[in-house]
Regions:
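Short beta-strand->alpha-helix junction loop in the catalytic core
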Residues: 41, 145-146, 163-177, 228
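Short acidic/histidine- and often glycine-rich active-site loop of Leloir-type glycosyltransferases
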Residues: 296-307, 311-312
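Short hydrophobic beta-strand element within catalytic cores of glycosyltransferases
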Residues: 290-294
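Nucleotide-activated donor-binding/catalytic signature segment of Leloir-type glycosyltransferases, i.e.
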Residues: 232-252
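Membrane-proximal helix-turn-helix segments that form the acceptor-binding/catalytic region
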Residues: 119-139, 148
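Conserved donor-binding/catalytic core segment of Leloir-type glycosyltransferases
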Residues: 181-200, 206-209, 222
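A short, well-ordered alpha-helix in the C-terminal region of glycosyltransferases
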Residues: 245, 320, 327, 334-349, ...
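Acidic donor-binding loop of glycosyltransferase active sites
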Residues: 262-276, 289
Length: 405
């Protein structure tokens, strides 16, 4: 072990989705870990609390020439580099020297092939992915659909993709106390939380609420967030006569959003395929909610085992979503069962501590096996991870989920 003494993570900016994972890297490696932030955060993300509490291990290249020079040197000298959304120049010399590199990527084709045929982007994709297919670079997949997307791109990263994601802080709970807290309303409580954008499809849960009310179910739906669809949703609620069932709340900071999740029994995630990952699924599972998630979100196939720790519905299908919610409303014991199993999934495997250790274990296994990207595709057997972060990523099609099976 301990093949990895230095790890440098390059990305455009540092945010709360990355902090917990990076904190774990720092606990293990100390000053051997650095996060390189290559650009200032956009105003709207900063206003959402993304840029708060920046740790000492973060180095901002845009603040000084000295910082930029350090980042350039670390790109070559580090035992392991993780490339997020950052200039490709950082890994080019490194790959020429055959040094191990992990690319941290959501699915590249979530909008289809259209961008691949824009000349500027075609050139970029060839440089980043196709030219490097046989170099010492592997993919940490921040979507269950990433591996197949890269395969479609002229078989980039052949058999070199591993499950990963984004890892917000894992919160520890006393499950008995948490379950009691969720039952205080006296009826089943459902939460939808996020930016109210078209790609998030919040209208689906409002339509499902109408179906549930018409079927005589007792429940409350709380919707948290702001965005272009907020007025549309408020109008839907009035038009459908749901004012007694549906309430709204404005945007919450990340910490307050997590607290709100802990108060609700069911969490619904409705986004379409433009949702690269969907960290709210992670957060809902951690909060011991019975999560009902769209099948096409990047996190869903990795985190949710249908009818074990949550439920999956067919993306965009109100009937499918309604039926899954009815399953839970018909059986409150099922809500608690899925909630407890959800927490255990996150507590045992899908958490920042395990993810950081798994990255280092995978990297050490590849180095031990003499990986050069061309001749070696698998880590040594003792380093292989069977399930969870850094286990092998399979190929998953958009239409993988068959409702009712």
């Amino acid at each position: 072990m301990n093949e990895i003494k230095t790890l440098t993570f390059y990305s455009n900016y540092f945010n709360h989705h990355q902090k917990a994972l990076c904190d774990e890297f720092y606990k293990i490696l100390g000053d051997g870990f650095k996060f390189i932030e290559t650009m200032p955060m956009e105003g709207f993300r900063a206003s959402m609390g993304w840029g708060e509490n920046t740790p000492d291990y973060v180095l901002r290249t845009y603040e000084s020439g000295k910082n930029a020079s350090i980042a350039d040197k670390l790109a070559v000298s580090s035992d392991l580099v993780i490339m997020g959304t950052a200039p490709e120049d950082y890994c080019e010399e490194r790959l020429k020297e055959g040094k191990l590199t992990f690319r941290y990527s959501e699915r590249p084709l979530k909008e289809g092939f259209i961008k691949f045929f824009i000349p500027r982007l075609t050139k970029k994709y060839i440089r980043m992915h196709i030219k490097n297919r046989n170099k010492n670079i592997y993919v940490l997949c921040a979507s269950a659909f990433t591996a197949l997307d890269f395969k479609k791109m002229f078989n980039s990263y052949p058999d070199k993709c591993y499950k990963f994601g984004y890892f917000p802080v894992h919160k520890e709970y006393d499950l008995n106390e948490l379950m009691d807290k969720k039952k205080k309303e006296g009826c089943v409580t459902i939460l939808w939380l996020g930016r109210m954008l078209k790609l998030k499809r919040p209208d689906l849960v409002v339509s499902a609420a109408k179906n549930l009310k018409d079927s005589g179910y007792d429940f409350k739906l709380h919707m948290v967030g702001e965005g272009e669809m907020r007025p549309v949703l408020e109008d839907m609620v009035k038009r459908l006569g749901l004012e007694d069932r549906v309430t709204f709340e404005d945007f919450l900071s990340p910490d307050k959003a997590r607290e709100r999740m802990s108060e609700y029994m069911i969490y619904v995630m409705t986004s379409n395929k433009l949702e690269g990952w969907g960290s709210v699924i992670y957060e809902g599972l951690n909060a011991s909610c019975a999560v009902v998630a769209s099948h096409i979100c990047g996190a869903t196939p990795y985190l949710i085992k249908d009818k074990e720790n949550g439920l999956i519905f067919k993306s965009g299908d109100v009937k499918s979503l309604t039926n899954k919610l009815k399953m839970l409303l018909d059986n409150n014991e099922l809500i608690e069962k899925y909630g407890r199993n959800a927490y255990e999934t996150m507590h045992s495997k899908w958490n920042p501590e395990n993810a950081a250790k798994s990255v280092l274990r995978l990297a050490e296994g590849l180095i031990k096996a003499g990986s050069d990207g061309f001749n070696v595709k698998y880590p040594d057997k003792e380093y292989i991870i069977e399930d969870g972060p850094c286990s092998k990523a399979g190929y998953l099609k958009n239409n993988w989920y068959k409702d009712g099976k």
